[in-house]
Amino acid sequence: MNIFEELKARGLVFQTTDEEALVKALTEGQVSYYTGYDPTADSLHLGHLVAILTSRRLQLAGHKPYALVGGATGLIGDPSFKDAERILQTKETVLDWSQKIKEQLSCFLDFDNGENKAELVNNYDWFSQISFIDFLRDVGKHFTVNYMMSKDSVKKRIETGISYTEFAYQVMQGYDFYELNAKHNVTLQIGGSDQWGNMTAGTELLRKKADKTGHVMTVPLITDATGKKFGKSEGNAIWLDAKKTSPYEMYQFWLNVMDDDAVRFLKIFTFLSLDEIAAIEEQFNAARHERLAQKTLAREVVTLVHGEAAYQQALNITEQLFAGAIKNLSAAELKQGLSNVPNYQVQAEDSLNIVDMLVTAGISPSKRQAREDLQNGAIYLNGERLQDLDYSLSTADRIDNQLTVIRRGKKKYAVLTY
């Protein structure tokens, strides 16, 4: 199958401007294409990964990617389907975030090898060189207000109010396409389905200003089987930066994907062939309780984003915590694996008697309950059962001289830090 057919088979094509013409272009020669990433945070997240990996698939098929960091559009803010105006960031912040996003993109696209090696561009480079008057005369005149207001991405905001700044965003994104076409012969833009309105503004500008045809292809916004927006864990984004979301947290996210999503996500987020995925699906459906699809998904994506060593560490943390083998893990590994459990900073004046500490740290609700928990064998200190009511914590109980892990019952953990 050709690359477009593969993208479709993987569920990666949501909408195109002219499918027949796009398929013809992709099968007859090398296509230069771009995907834009606005620096709205200091890291990309899993939601961005769909477009990034789609871009990589096209590169592997011989086409040339341009990764556009929106240093200028990031200063404005995209209003698409947003309920309220974005908070404007400072130029210094956007510049810093732009650099970090550039570094992350370098992990996924090949910027070094072959005639189709990826190139990084920043739209601040051209927007900083064009005057407001020139922009209105040379670009703005090609867009009617009626056309701009008809976009689904802004209709909702028209009712509640939208600033001229954000209203002009689609014109800026449209100009990106024009600029990249003029300088690099870029003829295809790839983005999320929520970007359709902004992206087709680019094909409109190309047609009117340069009498050229541009293509747009959107990838779907991923939701889980319940319709919940993908890439969030308990309201928090799953970031690609290991400092913001540890490899262990990312591993757990994939491991806990619902059965009805697992195979679909293997097609979208991994480079396993469709035949390999079909074989995994057959095994998975025969014994879903073994969670083969989720385990494969976790392995492939964590390795892709963070590397083999990070995957092996995440796997080891998972296995050791499941076995209760706390002492087999370093303090750094425990901080990853127990990042979401209550943490108590031990104070100099705190009593180190275990009964007192269980209450002080909020592990047991009262001294009476703490004593009962100890006597009943429900308390574990660094993975080992403790029943001595007179036991006092010492430096010997500190893993790497940094922390102590206490468990009450099977699942209630607390971390003491010093």
Curated annotation (Swiss-Prot):
InterPro entries: aa-tRNA-synth_I_CS (IPR001412), aa-tRNA-synth_Ic (IPR002305), Rossmann-like_a/b/a_fold (IPR014729), S4_RNA-bd_sf (IPR036986), SYY-like_C (IPR054608), Tyr-tRNA-ligase (IPR002307), Tyr-tRNA-ligase_bac-type (IPR024088), Tyr-tRNA-ligase_bac_1 (IPR024107). Pfam families: SYY_C-terminal, tRNA-synt_1b. ATP binds at residue 232. Belongs to the class-I aminoacyl-tRNA synthetase family. TyrS type 1 subfamily. GO terms for molecular function: ATP binding; RNA binding; tyrosine-tRNA ligase activity. Its main location: cytoplasm. Keywords: Aminoacyl-tRNA synthetase, ATP-binding, Cytoplasm, Ligase, Nucleotide-binding, Protein biosynthesis, RNA-binding. It catalyses: tRNA(Tyr) + L-tyrosine + ATP = L-tyrosyl-tRNA(Tyr) + AMP + diphosphate + H(+). The gene is tyrS. A motif ('HIGH' region) lies at residues 39-48. This is Tyrosine--tRNA ligase. Homodimer. Residues 352-418 form the S4 RNA-binding domain. HAMAP family: Tyr_tRNA_synth_type1 (MF_02006). One of its GO terms (cellular component) is cytosol. It comes from Streptococcus equi subsp. zooepidemicus (strain MGCS10565). GO terms for biological process: tyrosyl-tRNA aminoacylation. A motif ('KMSKS' region) lies at residues 229-233.
